[in-house]
Amino acid sequence: MSFGGINTFQQYNTDLGLGHNGVRISLNYFDGLPDPSLLNSLYSNELKLIFKSLLKRDETTKEKALMDLSNLISDFNQNEYFFNDIFLLCWSQIYAKLIISDYKVIRLQSHQITIMLVKSLRKKISKFLKDFIPLILLGTCELDYSVSKPSLNELTECFNKDPAKINALWAVFQEQLLNLVKEIVVNENEDTISDERYSSKEESEFRYHRVIASAVLLLIKLFVHNKDVSERNSSSLKVILSDESIWKLLNLKNGQNTNAYETVLRLIDVLYTRGYMPSHKNIMKLAVKKLLKSLTHITSKNILKVCPVLPSILNLLATLDDYEDGTIWSYDKSSKEKVLKFLSVSRTSPSPGFFNAVFALYSSTKRHSFLDYYLEWLPFWQKSVQRLNEKGFSARNSAEVLNEFWTNFLKFAEDSSEERVKKMVESEIFNSLSCGKSLSEYTKLNQTLSGVFPPDKWEREIEDYFTSDEDIRKIKVSFEKNLFALLVTSPNNESAISRLFDFFVQLIETDPSNVFNKYDGVYDALNYFLDSDMIFLNGKIGKFINEIPTLVQESTYQNFAGIMAQYSNSKFFKMNTDAITSLEDFFIVALSFNLPKTIILATMNELDNDIYQQLMKSDSLELELYIEDFMKNYKFDDSGEIFKGNNKFLNQRTITTLYRSAVANGQVEQFCAVLSKLDETFFSTLLLNTDFLSCALYEVSEDTNEKLFKLSLQLAKGNSEIANKLAQVILQHAQVYFSPGAKEKYVTHAVELINGCNDTSQIFFPANAIEVFARYMPAIDYRSSLVSSLSTNTHLLLTDDKPINLKNMQKLIRYALFLDALLDALPERVNNHIVAFITVVSELVTDYNCLSEEPNDLYYDFGHTFFKHGKVNLNFSDIVGNVIQPANGGDAMLTFDIAESNSVYFFYYSRVLYKVLLNSIDTVSSTTLNGLLASVESFVTKTVRDQKSTDKDYLLCAILLLMFNRSNSKDEITKLRTLLASQLIGIREVELVDQEFKSLALLNNLLDIPQADKQFVPIAPQRLNMIFRSILKWLDSDLAYEPSFSTVRLLLLDFFTKLMRFEGVRDMGITAFELSERLLADSLSMCQIDDTLYLLELRSSCLNLYETLSQGVSKNGEEISEYGDEIQENLIELMFLNFNQERNNQVSTLFYQKLYKVISSMELKKLESQYKRIFEVVLNDKDIGSNINQSRLLTTLLGSLVVKTQQDIIIEYELRIQKQTGSDVDGSASDNDVNSKFKLPQKLLQKVTDEVPKEYLEYENKNSFIKYLWYWHLILMYFKDTSYNMRQIFIEQLKEAGLINRMFDFITDQIDLRDTEFWKQVDTKEISEYNIVGNNFSPYKEDIFEECKKLLGHTLYQLFNNVGCLTSIWWLNIKDRTLQNDIEKFVSEFISPILIKNEFDDINSKMDRLTSNDDALTIKLNNITNEVKASYLIDDQKLEISFKLPKNYPLTNIQVNGVSRVGISEQKWKQWIMSTQHVITGMNGSVLDSLELFTKNVHLQFSGFEECAICYSILHAVDRKLPSKTCPTCKNKFHGACLYKWFRSSGNNTCPLCRSEIPFRR
């Protein structure tokens, strides 16, 4: 509600309401608002804004303003001057409005703020206490405890928790409190405290009821705290209590106002007990009448809502009944009926205290017999117990209500001496006991009822029950249990219990096989006796136990086993010396039964531990073997029951057996799920003595895994052996399964373990990183030279021809990633050694991703490397000096320990060193670079000349030369080049192989001179010729073909590849070319030998040299020497070779990219001789294995050859057709002969028929899948630029094999037709065009997967393009309408627009050619409606035809429509339209083909040519010929094809018009 605005008469009103300081304070919404002048006089603008907000109607705004005000008061010392008298006057008025808000938060905040002001201002606020204290105390009387309790607590704190001061408030402000109550009760109502414009009637009533209920409670507390309140303020009290506003709260019609109702009941009670009502009869009469009337409001509909208040009503009536011996009942003539009806309804839902209150009312009214004992009270009690029996005992507070009922009912029954009452009580007791609800847990009720009858009575009833008919026992559910509970509770019951025990034993002995099924209570009763302290039963129990082995049967085992287990844990067992014998006898019998072992072992587990141990030692039972056998075959199908509690048969031996059983049966998950129930000792044994941790941790579900780790960690903290084992398992799994998704799990566990067991850090963090690296990387894979920046320099260190173990490499990478992530969590453990290790492994990732068939870019995600960490000196000059002279340690890039380290580690570290130098060289000036060159020259010279130089020294030299080769100081570089070249002159082959090849490797690094002059020669010509002679000598030696020469051969290939790029060298003569070509020819020949060392590198080096030589030949115009043909033959042979070490990786990609470039540079004629071989290899997977790049290369070449050969075949075919046409009329036989020679290859068709992928692309082998699509791509290549006749042959061939529809079905099944997001990202060219080598020979599954998806779309597009109307036939025959709709949506969105655009582009490109020859012809294209219109202007009239391309073309055929005709007959016009349509639907022609036929027919028609008398067209739709056959009789002309068709269909050669014979030669 809003407090805005000022009442017009407010300023003239002298009544201050609740105010005492000159301003009116009121609870209503229209009066008592702060004067604007007062608000404007507030000290600060902040306070003005707060009060302005408090006058708003929005409750959220008020709440925020109160919070701001509270903050100001909290900082009272800073803002004390804000809170002056003007502020308090304004607040006193606003406060009265806020406490009636519907928002409890606002009410509570306003009370808290006022109390804060009282506490902070102290004496300064004293004159305002009369305004504030009544409202505060009203807040403590709210029925909503979330407001009243905090308010009372705040008030108590304000007065230092002094109860005397709080009580004094009620006396000191008695008058003001009564005035407040009077204001609320007498002056205010629903209409005054709520503005009807903004509040509904229900909201207004609820608000007023809440306020007046608080006022009533305030009045009650006023009476409680002030004994003289009625004397000092009698007039005010009378006004308040005479007003009906309070008594209107005695209304229970809707059942929503019970709190206010009960508050008024308390008021009546206080007024009566304090003597106020007896002295004010009018008020008492008014209250009682309202009270009695309210009894009629209670009905069966609202009883559940009002039942909590019923005891208060009854207790009040009982209290008021004391007034003048029941005079209150005379205040209402129908009071008796109202009370009886009230009791009748209220007994249906009694609450705690109800029956006590009923009995209190009965006790107070029985002296004047307000209600008759037998006619009214007795039926009430009887119906109440019946209702309770029907309702059941499981409801809330049912035990308390039941006990309360029987306590009062039994007291009520004692007032009668009549026998019928006693019988009724007995009957109702037994009815309650047999109502189907168990009373065994209701202790107080049992005590109440057990004393009603002697124990013998209960015992006889039990025996009678068991001897009664089964039907009766079924009806009386829980009856015997209730009787038994009362018997054992009743006093002096020993003899009765003894008789009952004998009775039960007799029942068992009489029918041992059926007794427990027949009598449910026998088993529970016997167990109760065994668990009790009834020592007097010892003899009987012992005797019974001794008999059990003779009584037990397989069907009753569970019951007797339960009794025996209970007995073993009871006091009676220790009192019986022969008890153990009885147990042995029992289990001997039990083991003879065909019972599951879990059942018998469950019984043993329940036995007393000492007794169990005695049984285990028994030779007659052999329990150890029994348990061992059980463990071996345990199935974990009992939710781990055997683990629960203190399991007796689990020990260090059996738990191991159980674990091995779980592993053998694949039930480790189930085993782990129940480990939390296992004893710690056994769990430790499991962890230490088995491989459980490595087998289970991270191999089970996430939840189970986390629980397993927590359990293991807890034990690890106290056991270093377990801690180390846990650490090793975490590390092992991180090495195998570490990934960004699993990173957090491994790291979190490692950190928790290190924090709990610090010693385990040495397992995670390597003490000797180089040793760890060497363990996983024992050798350098020679293939690294193909993918690393060091290239052939790799061979300066010892390399291995055998491929490295990629799994070990991957483990090392994952370990480093794990270590890197661990350092993020534990940054204090970062040091240079670990950073160096991680950096080296990060370099290793490059090799892994290039060599692996499944690269992972996420492996590059290292954080703690030299490049990111920043704790290592990366200054270029310092690093160069460090390389020349390694440091002893510190932050140097190269230290002695690294320089002396394992060669594999050193190799990858050198690559890191090279990268660091490469990254920093750009920041180095030329002067600095040239200044360092002298020391580099000295280092290289020393290394080359010193026989003791190591391989590592040479590799460091190579790195420095690669760097300084960029220097502009030519003299020093030339000097080094000359030095290295001189090392090669005149050396013997053995020296070369052993040592000097390293000089050649270093020299190669100085031959990369990208900006050299054209005539520049890197080595002096004389010296170069001397080197050539040495090389020639090496190549002529026998050693040249030995494995030891392999490295030299690679370096020589690299040498000539770089050297022959210089024009100056090429101009020196043919010696360099001849030598290069000879080396190349020999090397290519060696590529064909499987056991050639470094084969994959050799083949790539050969291609590099060939490419360089090819460029040299083209530039110089020189002819290739004698080796030319041999080289090309060997290059072609490379396509067919299967390399054993070949993998679908980056190495393969690089090679086949080069090979494709080389092969495609050759003339296609040179490959024609290989056509059949390529065809056979492509179709025979065994020849190329799983090498997808080889398949890709050969397939793309085959496609080119198919197109090339088809051009010649088409010409040959058409020539033969023409010859055949002129030779014979009936040419059908020879047709078949001609066609059989020009069909699609049968082997190719067989391939696409037999090798259809069985699974969806996502699950199919990607290489096999794309090969299948390539076969189809080859088939469709035959259609490229072919003739109409051959196209029809191909289509018919595919149709006969059923391949067209099958492929359509396959594609639409494989494509996710609803995955529109993917296809929206695909460019239209990727659908309309496809290049087999378009993916740059990427062999990876992800790339091939995406390529397959796009190729499926392209193949569908090509099929649509080439098979014409067969597309529509296939689509229309799809029976699954959902699939049909999905296909249509997909095609319409992604393929049809391309096909339609192609048709329009085709017409656009040739439109000028069509219209230029005929001015009367006009062609119009409408890209919006996808329509083509062609019109002829004839005598100012149009002859027009249209071609409508549907949105889902080609699923629906193009429609040819005759728009308007002129100058020809309708029959001829229709025939033209049909012929035009036939070109598209029958001949798979395009719109342009159809349009050309139509325009030519029109042109010829109006040029005077005669049409065919059969088809009415001038040009034949198929062969485009004029009518050339004439009937000699009627002279009509016919197309040869039309007439031939007529002859075949009619069976003779007569004219279709005149029927005369026509002699016809086709």
Swiss-Prot record:
It comes from the Eukaryota. GO terms for cellular component: chromosome, telomeric region; cytosol; cytosolic ribosome; nucleus; RQC complex. InterPro entries: ARM-type_fold (IPR016024), LTN1/Rkr1 (IPR039795), LTN1_E3_ligase_6th (IPR054477), Ltn1_N (IPR054476), LTN1_UBC (IPR054478), RING-CH-C4HC3_LTN1 (IPR039804), Znf_RING (IPR001841), Znf_RING-CH (IPR011016). It holds the Pfam family Ltn1_1st. Pathway: Protein modification; protein ubiquitination. Component of the ribosome quality control complex (RQC), composed of the E3 ubiquitin ligase RKR1/LTN1, RQC1 and RQC2, as well as CDC48 and its ubiquitin-binding cofactors associated with the 60S ribosomal subunits. This is E3 ubiquitin-protein ligase listerin. It comes from Saccharomyces cerevisiae (strain ATCC 204508 / S288c).
